[in-house]
From Swiss-Prot:
One of its GO terms (biological process) is protein transport. Residues 543-553 have a biased composition (Acidic residues). The gene is Kif20a. Residues 856-865 have a biased composition (Polar residues). It comes from Mus musculus (Mouse). Residues 63-506 form the Kinesin motor domain. ATP binds at residues 159-166. One of its GO terms (cellular component) is midbody. Pfam families: Kinesin. This is Kinesin-like protein KIF20A.
Length: 887
């Protein structure tokens, strides 16, 4: 027994035609299957017309169609007050969902999360009043026409459980769904053009296999056993038909999501007469049959399988004594297209056989009673119709088109099924539907962002693996969303609407064509001689493209021709590598040049910005330095002016002090002579005390001078402040000169005092001596006052120098420390205020003229002894202020 496996011809499914077919729209991709040598010259092709290719190109930008259908309320649902207006149709394309009370969406909205009203757009919305025939004419009719023309279509229903998905797909005996109506339209359109014998059978994803007479009889016996097995079960169930008639009615009235009234397990007892009536009814639809080419014959094959708990089961499996069903494997062909291994494909001749086989598959499908549906589909069922387009009477390579209708199991929250087998089923159903949503979201993102392509998780679920071909180039897809308008299922309905919103954004885009030359073109180009058989084939197919069969079967070519092809391919590969290397070098050079240019531009921008910032900072600091210079100049000019005034005043006082001793000395000599005998002992003691006081003043003066030199070294200003300190140093030198002059005068007074003492020893004038001592005391007090004023002046100069040094140092290091100058001035001002006498008001700042009185105060007459005056001068507070603190 020999099997002959064929792939579609070049004019239909070759690499060159992939460009004309969009993603989700094109027919099955070619397979490099082995073609028998004796069939190569007899193969004929059915090439797509130019108009069909143009139509395909026009549809490349079309979005995926998503239809919405709302089922009506049941009487029991109206009794439970499920109609709360949560599902509203705004127009034929817009649906508004309003969250009812006690729904999770409304509670989230009250907490500030989410929205209470959602609006969705669909290709078309069908209300509860739309019947099955109208729904089919508006949705499925054009898709069936495309399938008869050679395209592949996938239609899948999505929605929560008990939303009417199975009713939309299969319907009832009186109101057929889209699947029976599609079968009726297909067979009505193919009347008189069906292939008489099933000698070609679909295989893998898009291949066919030739069957001999024995294999044809086996296929017929398999179909007959399925049909007879179904009829025997119907005859056995006739005896209990009356007993379950009431239960079937209840089940039909409470369920919209299972095969009701003739398709569910509760209504499997429809008689053969009813089947005949149903098939006759579907065989005569109101729609006009689709016109197909008259020179083409068609062969219709169907398959029916389910995905239950991530396991694949054939629903058209012949009856056997085994209680455990055999699981199927999901495999890939050599081109990566998925297919179900060992899946039964049954040849059908009319709609009645297809309906009976559908009924047999429904009996084998997994149903169960759930919280929301008494007869709920617990698996994803996929009913596929493959049509082989045959031309000619001999051996042919057919074109294959496929129509797949998938009844997805309803999504349901696990809170309704908390344990047992139903919980496991619900988990697997929700997982597969979630994976389908992820795949659709990834496809949408890849279409919107061409530069960054994400991996599409088709392999995470068996359902998405089956759908992969329709989503990636082998056909087109359509989604039918079924909505349950009950308020209790609003949250699930909202999730289904959001899921469909992703699918509605997918766009049919053409796949990438690599443009790789075929093996036949290599041989024609590089072979010097062509065989006679190939010459005939080239003449017959001169207007067609290279078929994949020529590439698949290399036995028709000679060894030398194949070696030449290998050498040509090596040369072509080397050329391509050189071109790609040159392109890579060029791209790298361009990228490097662009990067260098960008770096230069950035460097230039940074340098310009730094220059601008530098100029701004220089202007800012120059302005600040200018302001500071003006303020310092004004301040020190005022200080110098006030200091000059004080020095002039001190000089005036010094001149007065010099003149007074000279005037009083002449009169004091006579007094000294008269009183020297009376006050000899007292004057000697007072002189010693005055001498000791003078020595103490000298010691303090020397220590003050040393301390002044020390502070001058410490407070030596930086070079920028040198012009300001020169004037101050000059004034300080003048003050020191005045101090030296005062010392000289003090020495002269001491000498005069000694001479007066010697004179007192020889004179007896006590009154004159007392008067002379009084004058000396006055002179000493004035000198002490003058010395104290000079010392205070020196302290002020030190303080001013400290201010200047601190200010200039802060300016020299950073301009930001200028604010600290004000606080330093405040602290220094506070120290000066602490030196003020207690009787001065706080609002005035004492200056040099306020520190010491200009004229000596009058002494009290009660305490006028020389000893008391000396004690007062020693305990004067004016002498404590400059030396009592350490600056």
């Amino acid at each position: 027994m020999s099997h002959r496996i064929l792939s579609p011809p070049a004019g239909l499914l070759s690499d060159e035609d992939v460009v004309d077919s969009p993603i989700l729209e094109s027919t099955a991709a070619d397979l490099r299957s082995v073609v028998r040598k004796d069939l190569l010259s007899d193969c004929s092709v059915i090439s797509a017309s130019l108009e069909d290719k143009q139509a395909l190109l026009e549809d490349t930008s079309e979005k995926v169609k998503v239809y919405l259908r709302i089922r009506p309320f049941l009487t029991s649902e109206l009794d439970r007050q499920e109609d709360q207006g949560c599902v509203c149709i705004e127009n034929t394309e817009t649906l508004v969902l309003q969250a009812p009370k006690d729904s999770f969406a409304l509670k989230s909205n009250e907490r500030g999360v989410g929205q209470a009203t959602h609006k969705f757009t669909f290709s078309q919305i069908f209300g509860p009043e739309v019947g099955q025939v109208a729904f089919f004419n508006l949705t499925m009719k054009e898709m069936v026409k495309d399938v008869l023309k050679g395209q592949n279509w996938l239609i899948y229903t999505y929605g929560v459980t008990n939303s009417g998905k199975t009713y939309t797909i299969q319907g009832t005996s009186k109101d057929a769904g889209i699947l029976p109506q599609s079968l009726a339209l297909i067979f009505n359109s193919l009347q008189g053009q069906l292939h008489p014998t099933p000698d070609l059978k679909p295989l893998l994803s898009n291949e066919v296999i030739w069957l001999d007479s024995k294999q044809i009889r086996q296929e017929e016996m398999k179909k007959l056993s399925l049909l007879i097995g179904g009829l025997q079960e119907e005859e056995l169930s006739t005896s209990v038909k009356k007993r379950v008639h009431t239960e079937s009615r209840i089940g039909a009235s409470n369920s919209f999501d299972s095969g009701v009234a003739g398709l569910s397990s509760t209504s499997q007892f429809t008689s053969s007469s009813q089947l005949d009536e149903t098939s006759q009814l579907w065989a005569q639809p109101d729609t006009v049959p689709v016109s197909v080419p008259a020179d083409i014959r068609f062969s219709v094959w169907i398959s029916f399988f389910e995905i239950y708990n991530e396991l694949l089961y054939d629903l058209l499996e012949p009856p056997s004594h085994q209680h455990k069903r055999q699981t199927l494997r999901l495999c890939e062909d050599q081109n990566g297209n998925p297919y179900v291994k060992d899946l039964n494909w049954i040849h059908v001749r009319d709609v009645e056989e297809a309906w009976k086989l559908l009924k047999v598959g429904r009996k084998n499908q997994s149903f169960a009673s759930t919280h929301m549906n008494q007869q709920s589909s617990r698996s994803h069922s996929i009913f596929s119709i493959r049509i082989l387009h045959l031309q000619g009477e001999g051996d042919i390579v057919p074109k294959i088109s496929e129509l797949s209708l998938c009844d997805l199991a309803g999504s349901e929250r696990c809170k309704h099924q908390k344990s047992g087998e139903r919980l496991k089923e619900a988990g697997n159903i929700n997982t597969s539907l979630h994976t389908l949503g992820r795949c659709i979201a990834a496809l949408r993102q890849n279409q919107q962002n061409r530069s960054k392509q994400n991996l599409i998780p088709f392999r995470d679920s068996k359902l998405t693996r089956v759908f992969q071909g329709f989503f990636t180039g082998r056909g087109r897809s359509c989604m039918i969303v079924n909505v349950n308008p009950c308020a209790s299922t609003y949250d699930e309905t909202l999730h289904a609407a959001k899921f469909s919103a992703l699918a509605s954004q997918l766009v049919h885009a053409p796949p990438v064509h690599l443009g790789i030359p075929s093996l036949h073109s290599f041989i024609k180009k590089h072979s010097p001689q062509v065989g006679p058989g190939l010459e005939k084939e080239d003449k017959a197919d001169s207007d067609l493209e290279d078929s994949p069969e020529d590439e698949a079967d290399v036995s028709v070519y000679g060894k030398e021709e194949l070696l030449q092809v290998v050498e040509a391919m090596k040369a072509l590969l080397l050329k391509e590598r050189q071109e790609k290397l040159q392109l890579e070098i060029q791209l790298r050079e361009e990228i490097c040049n662009e990067m260098v240019e960008q770096m230069q531009q950035r460097e230039q921008w940074c340098s310009e910005r730094l220059d601008n910032q530098k100029e701004l900072m220089e202007e800012l600091y120059e302005e600040k330095l200018k302001i500071l210079k003006e303020s310092l100049t004004t301040f020190y000019q005022e200080q110098i002016q006030e200091r000059d005034e004080k020095i002039e005043e001190l000089e005036t006082l010094l001149q007065e002090a010099k003149q007074q001793p000279a005037a009083q000395q002449s009169g004091g000599l006579s007094l000294l002579r008269r009183s020297q005998r009376l006050a000899a002992s007292a004057s000697t003691q007072q002189f010693q005390e005055v001498k000791a006081e003078l020595e103490q003043c000298k010691t303090e003066l020397s220590s003050t001078t040393a301390e002044l030199h020390k502070y001058q070294q410490v407070l030596k200003p930086p070079p920028p402040a040198k012009p300001f300190t020169i004037d101050v140093d000059k004034k300080l030198e003048e003050g020191q000169k005045n101090i030296r002059l005062l010392r000289t005068e003090l020495q002269k007074l001491g000498q005069s005092l000694q001479s007066a003492e010697r004179a007192c020893c020889h004179s007896t004038g006590a009154g004159k001596l007392r008067q002379a001592l009084t004058n000396c005391d006055d002179i000493l007090i004035k000198q002490n006052q003058t010395l104290a004023e000079l010392q205070n002046n020196m302290v002020l100069v030190k303080l001013d120098l400290q201010k200047k040094a601190a200010c200039i140092a802060e300016q020299y290091h950073t301009v930001l420390k200028l604010q600290g100058q004000a606080s330093a001035k405040k602290r220094l001002g506070a120290n000066q205020e602490n030196q003020q006498p207690n009787h001065q008001p706080p609002g005035k700042k004492p200056f040099l003229r306020n520190l010491l009185p200009r004229t000596p105060t009058c002494q009290s007459s009660t305490d006028s002894s020389p000893y008391a005056r000396i004690l007062r001068s020693r305990h004067s507070p004016l002498l404590k202020s400059p030396f009592g603190k350490k600056y």
